[in-house]
Amino acid sequence: DLHLLSRRQRQMCIRDSVITAEYQEFYLVNVYTPNSQRGLERLDYRQIWEDAFRDYLLKLDQIKPVLVCGDLNVAHREIDLKNWKTNRNNAGFTDEERAKMTELLTAGFTDSFRHLYPEKEGAYTWWSYMFKAREKNAGWRIDYWLVSDRWADRIEDSVIYADITGSDHCPVGLVLK
């Protein structure tokens, strides 16, 4: 359904890892959001990309509910990373990136994990390979399941499988009624 977007938006989405599967009742969108990079070298590009991605999701959502899963490369709230004070204005925790996440949620999507566990601390999906970060659980929650607001009441559980290793990220799961 990339045909719903302009040519430029399609190119941006395709290049930066968006895969969409259509099912009878919903769309499933898997995404890797561009990282702003050290020194925020790609922050401007990311902001444009985020607008295009949000517009794409909203167009899909007009047709049927949307489930979004993937690495959104943003810790939305201070509770979503261990060391938020020292990471302020680093890639993944800038005011701009967090504002774009807020815009996406406000536009009609629910963060499934925070919907069920609004104040749960220590729930992370990514840890640096340095400084024994995983062992110390000094991580970030940057992998999400987002659900169209109209399906928020169908969220039964949103799971972070922190014990599964093999990557600097861990899997996340979603259970719907």
Language-model regions, residue ranges each:
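Active-site beta-strand termini and strand-to-loop segments that position acidic
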Residues: 21-24, 148-149, 174-177
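Short hydrophobic/aromatic beta-strand or adjacent loop that forms the aromatic wall/cage
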Residues: 15-20, 141-143, 169-173
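Surface polyanion/phosphate-binding segment centered on an Asp-His-Pro turn
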Residues: 159-177
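Single conserved hydrophobic/aromatic residue that forms the stacking wall/gate
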Residues: 1-10, 14
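Metal-dependent phosphoesterases centered on the DNase I-like endonuclease/exonuclease/phosphatase
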Residues: 49-138, 142
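Beta-strand-turn-beta hairpins that frame and shape the catalytic cleft
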Residues: 15-32
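A short, charged helix-loop
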Residues: 31, 36-41
